[in-house]
Amino acid sequence: MKNMVRLLLPLLGALAGSFCARFLGSEGSAIMTTTRVSFSSILVVSFLFCFHFHSFRLKGPQKKIIYLFLVFSMGFVGSLIRIEVIHLVGGLALPVLGPLVLNAIGGQALPSTGPSGSGSSSMWEEDSFELGVLEESDSPPAGGPERKRGNPR
C-alpha cells in the first residue's frame, strides 16, 4: 500500500500540473514564466528541507499528511517544469527529457500531443473546415454590397 501511494501521488501531482497548464491554454503558458516555475520549485525544495529537518518532532498523522503533500507538490512542480521546458525549447527536447522526467516522478510520462490532439502525428494537417473558411475569405461582408459571381452579361 505504501509503494502504491508513492507511485500514485507523483502521478496525481503531474496530472494536476498538466491539467492546470492545459486549462490555462496558451495564455497560461505565457503567464507561467520561468521565474514563477523556478520559485515554486525552490519552495518545494525548501519545504523538503524543513520537513526533513523537523521530521523527528512530528508523530502520527501529521507526519503522513505532510509527507503526502510533499510528494504531491513534487509531482506538480515537476510537471510544470516539464511543460515550461517543452514550451521554451520545443518538442526537440522530448527525447532528452523523457528519461529525466521518468526518473524524477517515478512513473511513465504521458505522450505529447500535437496541435490537433493526435498523439503520434509529427506533421500538422489542416482541417478541411478551416480550409473552406479560408477559401471563403473573398466573400462580401454581411452589411456590404453584394456582387454577382460568374460571367457578367
UniProtKB/Swiss-Prot annotation:
Task: Decide whether keyword Nucleus is in the record.
Answer: no
Question: Which residue ranges does UniProt annotate as crossing the membrane?
Answer: 7-27, 31-51, 64-84
Q: Where is this region: Disordered?
A: 132-153
Q: Please provide one cellular component term from the Gene Ontology annotations of this protein.
A: mitochondrial membrane
Where is this protein localized, as stated in its record?
A: Mitochondrion membrane
InterPro entries from the entry? Mt_uS3-like
**Primary site of residence:** mitochondrion
Does the keyword Methyltransferase feature in the UniProt annotation? no
Q: Which PANTHER family match?
A: ATP SYNTHASE 9 MITOCHONDRIAL-RELATED, TRANSMEMBRANE PROTEIN
Name of the protein in question? Uncharacterized mitochondrial protein AtMg01020
- What organism is the protein native to? Arabidopsis thaliana
Q: Which UniProt keywords apply?
A: Membrane, Mitochondrion, Transmembrane, Transmembrane helix
In the UniProt entry for this protein, what further remark is given in the free-text comments? A stretch of 270 kb of the mitochondrial genome is duplicated within the centromere of chromosome 2 resulting in the duplication of the gene. The expression of this duplicated gene (At2g07674) is demonstrated.
Which membrane topology describes this protein?
Answer: Multi-pass membrane protein
